[in-house]
Regions:
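Ferredoxin-reductase
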Residues: 2-94
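Structural and coupling elements of P-loop NTPases
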Residues: 96-98
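A short, basic/flexible loop-to-alpha-helix module at the beginning of a structural domain
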Residues: 87, 100-103
Length: 103
């Protein structure tokens, strides 16, 4: 089965506790993207030139409801380029690529 890449629009974030935020992304797809508990998506973030700097895997934190909205719960990693982007640089409406679900 081939991997499908989606555009994911950043729609918001909320501080859960100090250093951990919830993030919401809306997958742009003509049909619902189904996933199961325990699965994850790989995000290609604009945080470097090499794939190892850009690709991050995040477990899905919400139950599938057909809305194509992914909720992620992410802990800030000091010095982490992906953390810098997600916690400080991303803006509502920004679009990143992601693939999945996997796992």
């Amino acid at each position: 089965m081939s991997t499908v890449w989606y555009d994911a629009e950043f729609i918001g974030q909320k501080v859960e506790v100090a250093g951990t935020n919830r993030f919401w992304f809306k997958l742009k797809s003509d049909s619902p993207v189904a996933y199961k508990p325990g699965q994850f998506f790989v995000f290609d973030l604009p945080s470097g030139e090499k794939r190892a700097d850009r690709w991050r895997s995040y477990s899905i934190a919400n139950i599938y409801d057909g809305s194509n909205i992914l909720e992620l719960c992410i802990t800030y990693e000091k010095g982490g380029v992906a953390s810098q982007y997600l916690f400080n640089d991303i803006n509502k409406g920004d679009v990143v690529k992601c693939k999945g679900p996997e796992g």
